[in-house]
Design a protein with these regions (language model features):
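N-terminal secretory signal peptides
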Residues: 1-25, 36
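Beta-strand-rich modules
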Residues: 487-504
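N-terminal active-site segment of His-dependent metallophosphoesterases
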Residues: 46-112, 249
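A short C-terminal boundary segment appended to hydrolase-like catalytic domains
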Residues: 53, 318-451, 455-459
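Recognizes extended acidic, P/S/T-rich segments that occur
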Residues: 444-488
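Active-site neighborhood of phospho(di)ester-bond hydrolases with catalytic His/Asp-centered motifs
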Residues: 62-63, 96-101, 134-141, 233-236, ...
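Extracellular fibronectin type III
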Residues: 504-514
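Extended active-site neighborhood of metal-dependent phosphoesterases/phosphodiesterases
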Residues: 107-220, 224-226, 250, 254, ...
Length: 514
């Protein structure tokens, strides 16, 4: 993209959305997208369609950069962070938003490394054209608590006094100011180009800390925050009951629900959070109800939401009731032969947010191949008038992904390592990407196994390359499911594989026998 030259007064006229057709799409597709937006039907569009014109505000939106002082860690150093910042600088952003976990191990030197990277890319806190670029950062659990995650921090600083001197949680105010030149406050607010950003830090080892102080803050600033103009709220964990579902609270990635209660009175609020590391290619990463909530994913490494088909996937690694003895369960569970979906260090997610008078555009991309990973999200303004990202709306509009007409399911018998590294007999199912329907992307595949004895099993696997762009070589390639042979029913076996998208729409099945 070309640099955006912006006036020193930060006052820019709104360009009509039909001003030009992005080179990446046809004029027909462009006009169809514009018509859908005007009719209130659009919630996504090909990258760039609604970014034409000069925004009133643009900012980087990333989370979980996890700068690590551990040289053996794949997160070591600031290379990815600097690369991402450099791209955002080239876009002429007005600000950079980071929703926590700047430091990986809760050490002062890691926050200082992040600060040095910022100054390297934005010297004097200025962009390419000399305008100021604001820092809008909050802390996360790794900043506050990760000194106690494992032994690295204590082994790096074995002397108790030296350790205490480098424990970030004990020195938030002074280290924050020395690293970023900003005053630290548990909750605060910045105004950029007339738009307000509320920042709420993780400064206690408790997910219940955010709601009570936000309620007080909103009450104090109600008059300036009320109305149709959007404001942005930042915290590290997802507000409970927003992204990924109304009841989702898996393993502490959400707060206690009081933030949702506080923001419910402000339909113009847009919440940004991280913490889960879950891929922003998952369409459940944006939610609308009484306000709007967005997951920013993870710059350091990408993870995957496992709320669907809970005990049947995606890792297929744990038996019910075994959570207190995870290691033993990993070794004992016959499902352990299935692929393990650990964090992907080859995919680094981030977003670019552009605010116009009638819309907010969120461009999603990854910084390994420097490409978009999905359609842009388009939030109509004012947000109270239209909620295209409400889950019930999107479920009704969901289009099931489909396999190509010549697709075939391949079934082979082989051996594979289990989690104990023992070779075990397995059945391998291979199938092509279900990318035959434009705009319908597979998130996972539902696998049904029927035995000759009448027994049935259900398993699921994530689509290959689901964290990357749909046209990437990885995402366009085949997926597979590896099943431990001794977990399958006896007798002749029948297999059925159906592609599914994030909201549950399932395509037609590929079938086969063994």
């Amino acid at each position: 993209m070309k640099d955006n030259a912006k006036s020193a007064q930060h006052c820019r006229p709104l360009a009509p959305i039909h001003a030009e057709v992005p080179k990446c799409i046809s004029r027909r597709a462009f006009l169809q997208s514009v018509a859908a937006f005007a009719a209130g039907r659009a919630f996504a569009a090909p990258p760039g369609v609604f970014s034409v014109g000069t925004p009133l505000l643009s900012f980087a939106a990333i989370s979980d950069i996890h700068v690590s002082a551990r040289k053996t860690s794949p997160k070591y150093g600031t290379k990815v962070f600097e690369h991402a910042l450099g791209w955002y600088r080239a876009q002429g952003v007005d600000a950079v938003v980071i929703t926590g976990d700047l430091a990986d191990n809760g050490l002062t030197e890691e926050l200082e490394m992040a600060g040095a990277a910022w100054r390297k890319v934005f010297p004097g806190n200025k962009g390419l054209d000399g305008r100021p670029v604001e820092k809008v950062f909050v802390t996360g659990n790794h900043d506050h608590d990760a000194w106690n995650y494992g032994m690295f921090a204590k082994e790096r600083h074995p002397d108790p006094a030296d350790f205490e001197a480098h424990k970030l949680a004990s020195h938030y105010p002074e280290c924050w100011e020395s690293s970023f030149g900003d005053r630290y406050a548990p909750i605060g607010m910045k105004t950029i180009n007339g738009y307000r950003f509320i920042t709420s830090h993780w400064d206690k080892g408790d997910l219940r800390q955010f709601g009570p102080r936000l309620k007080k803050f909103l009450a104090k600033h109600r008059d300036e925050l009320s109305g149709e103009k959007p404001f942005f709220y930042l915290q590290h964990p997802h507000p409970l009951g927003t992204v990924y579902g109304p009841t989702f609270a898996a393993r502490g990635v959400c707060d206690d629900g009081t933030v949702k209660e506080a923001l419910a009175a402000f339909p113009n609020a847009v919440s940004f959070s991280g913490h889960s590391h879950w891929a922003i290619t998952d369409e459940r990463a944006i939610w609308q109800g009484d306000f709007t909530a967005v997951n920013l994913g993870c710059l350091a490494r990408t993870g995957f939401c496992r709320t669907r088909n809970a005990m049947n996937g995606y890792e297929n690694w744990r038996t019910p009731g075994a959570r207190k003895k995870i290691k033993a369960a990993l070794e004992a569970d016959g499902l352990k032969a299935m692929p393990h979906y650990g964090p992907s260090f080859v995919c680094h997610h981030g977003s670019l947010v552009k605010v116009f008078a009638d819309r907010i555009v969120i461009e999603r991309r990854e910084f390994t191949h420097d490409r978009p990973v999905a359609d842009d999200w388009i939030i109509p303004l004012p947000v109270a008038a239209s909620r295209p990202f409400a889950y019930d709306v999107r479920e009704k509009a969901a289009v099931a992904p489909e396999f190509p007409s010549d697709a075939r399911l391949t079934i082979t018998e082989s051996t594979a390592n289990n989690r104990k590294k023992d070779k075990v007999p397995v059945v391998v199912l291979s199938f092509p990407a279900a990318n035959a329907v434009s705009g319908a992307r597979p998130y996972d595949y539902l696998i049904e196994i029927s035995g000759g004895n009448g027994e049935k099993l259900v398993r699921s696997v994530l689509a290959q390359g689901v964290e990357l762009g749909p046209d990437s070589q990885t995402a366009s390639g085949p997926s597979k499911c590896v099943l431990a042979r001794d977990t399958l029913p006896a007798g002749p076996l029948e297999f059925s594989v159906r592609p599914g998208e994030c909201f549950g729409a399932l395509g037609r099945a590929l079938s086969g026998r063994l």
